[in-house]
């Protein structure tokens, strides 16, 4: 609910700008046909609702994405395509959804017809269960980059393990993202983008997707930099029965269920009598996504995702590209939506709880819930960020860590720090919903992100110099009222939480 409210604030605040856009047509010829979009009031050309793969509905449910067929005539790219199906309890009633949903969007400066501008490919979050590619991409495009966003299959339509599937692929949503990158490689030049300078970036599940693409062989060479914002790649994922290595312990220290058993539980809730694929492909897709409890998890299937990203990073299996990652000061704000209670997570901490309470004394002094939520957020997101950034040394690639520490009193007065996904609002937000100090910080953050996409280094001459993170000790760029780089920040806390993670894996490996 919090993520939905944050996104509604963002989209409603920007609606008047989008409505004021001019209707000047802008045409482009892609590999499959002609499209026409619009040039808006900011001087940005936008193309919305471009199909990057054929419909995955009906008999193509739980199949890899298929290439787009050639189009005849001129196709309108003025409106977003439908979002992928998602639970009714979480989606806005105004959101148009359909199982036929594999569409992407492009924003590019109007002057960039023959240029080769950096390309920034945004992957939305939403727990792999909600969300879509509707963003105000013109906000970043005005900085001289080409922005791409896309929909990808969600919930059990995007992540499904079933014993009768002929392939060992379970992450169809991840394959959708690879297909979108294929489309970028083939077509982005006609929009003024450089196919040899593509940056992935995404928040939350989108950040996790970035990390998964970093270790996906099918995505190799299709992007050249990556920014994972609040990715959570250290937590255990369900495994298929034929995936290598046994299933690790889950977050509450119980043996994780197999991916097949989790998938069958969802399927039985949607259609109790179906045990084979043909009838399941005929079940209304909305029933399937409505049957998911909590978030959707990607699946370790030995193919599209060989193992948890953190384990692969530590073994040097990730792409050798410049990498930025980090999170916010109160990531634990997302805990109520995670499906893990305060008491359950406290039990997971076990004998370390007293040490952790001492390290987080100021948070526990406010309340036990605030203390546990802060620890949860740091464990889930910041431990992952530091571990993956440090592991980039195994492939001799540079990495940078960031930490947003703003108290957005004007927007969310009851937050004790910067909430989960607030950096998305900073990247794409509006002056009317954040105060002047936060607006200035947001503009600086955008400039660092764009420069990283342009050059592979987040260095802006007139702003604070940002050193790589892990040569001698942790170096975090802290975005606040005044930005600064801090060495060893959070090390005492993250060292303890990382040790817990290592013990959890050592019990089963």
Go through the PLM ranges and name each one.
Residues 153-155, 201-205, 403-410, 464-470:
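Short, solvent-exposed turn/loop segments enriched in Gly/Ser/Thr/Pro and often Arg
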Residues 86-274, 312-335, 397, 456, ...:
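Serine-hydrolase-like catalytic core of hydrolytic proteins
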Residues 283-285, 407, 456-483:
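Polar, surface-exposed loop/tail segments
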Residues 20-171, 195, 435-448, 454-465, ...:
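Non-catalytic accessory segments of hydrolases
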């Amino acid at each position: 609910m919090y993520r939905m409210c944050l996104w509604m604030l963002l989209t409603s605040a920007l609606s008047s700008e989008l409505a004021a856009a001019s209707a000047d047509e802008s045409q482009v010829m892609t590999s499959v046909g002609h499209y026409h979009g619009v040039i808006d009031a900011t001087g940005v050309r936008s193309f919305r609702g471009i199909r990057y793969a054929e419909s995955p509905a009906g008999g193509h449910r739980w199949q890899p994405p298929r290439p787009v067929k050639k189009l005849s005539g001129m196709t309108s790219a003025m409106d977003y395509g439908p979002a992928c199906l998602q639970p009714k309890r979480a989606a806005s009633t105004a959101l148009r959804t359909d199982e036929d949903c594999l569409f992407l969007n492009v924003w590019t400066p109007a002057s960039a017809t023959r240029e080769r501008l950096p390309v920034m490919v945004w992957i939305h979050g939403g727990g792999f269960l909600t969300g879509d590619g509707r963003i105000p991409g013109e906000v970043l495009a005005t900085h001289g980059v080409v922005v791409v966003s896309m929909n990808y299959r969600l919930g059990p339509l995007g992540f499904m393990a079933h014993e009768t599937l002929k392939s060992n692929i379970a992450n169809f949503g991840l394959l959708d993202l690879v297909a979108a990158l294929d489309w970028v490689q083939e077509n982005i030049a006609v929009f003024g983008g450089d196919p040899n300078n593509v940056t992935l970036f995404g928040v939350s599940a989108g950040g996790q997707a970035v990390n998964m693409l970093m270790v996906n062989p099918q995505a190799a060479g299709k992007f050249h930099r990556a920014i994972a914002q609040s990715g959570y790649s250290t937590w255990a994922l369900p495994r298929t029965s034929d995936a290598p290595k046994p299933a690790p312990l889950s977050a509450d220290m119980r043996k994780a269920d197999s991916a097949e058993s989790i998938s069958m539980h969802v399927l039985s809730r949607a259609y109790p009598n179906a045990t084979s694929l043909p009838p399941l492909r005929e079940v209304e897709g909305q029933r399937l996504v409505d049957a998911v409890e909590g978030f959707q998890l990607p699946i370790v299937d030995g193919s599209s995702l060989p193992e948890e990203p953190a384990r692969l990073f530590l073994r040097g299996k990730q792409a050798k590209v410049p990498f930025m990652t980090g999170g916010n000061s109160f990531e634990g704000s997302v805990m109520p939506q995670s499906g893990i209670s305060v008491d359950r997570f406290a039990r997971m901490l076990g004998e370390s709880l007293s040490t952790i309470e001492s390290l987080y004394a100021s948070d526990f002094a406010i309340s036990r819930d605030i203390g546990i939520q802060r620890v949860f957020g740091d464990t889930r997101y910041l431990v992952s960020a530091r571990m993956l950034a440090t592991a980039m040394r195994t492939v001799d690639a540079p990495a940078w860590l960031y930490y947003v520490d703003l108290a957005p009193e004007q927007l969310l007065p009851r937050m004790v720090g910067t909430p989960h996904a607030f950096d998305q609002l900073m990247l794409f937000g509006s002056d009317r919903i954040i105060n002047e100090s936060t607006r200035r910080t947001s503009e600086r953050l955008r400039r660092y992100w764009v420069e990283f996409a342009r050059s592979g280094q987040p260095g802006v001459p007139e702003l604070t110099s940002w050193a790589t993170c892990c040569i001698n000790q942790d170096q975090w760029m802290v975005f606040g009222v005044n930005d600064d780089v801090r060495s060893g920040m959070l090390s005492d806390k993250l060292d303890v939480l990382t040790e817990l993670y290592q013990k959890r894996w050592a019990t089963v490996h």
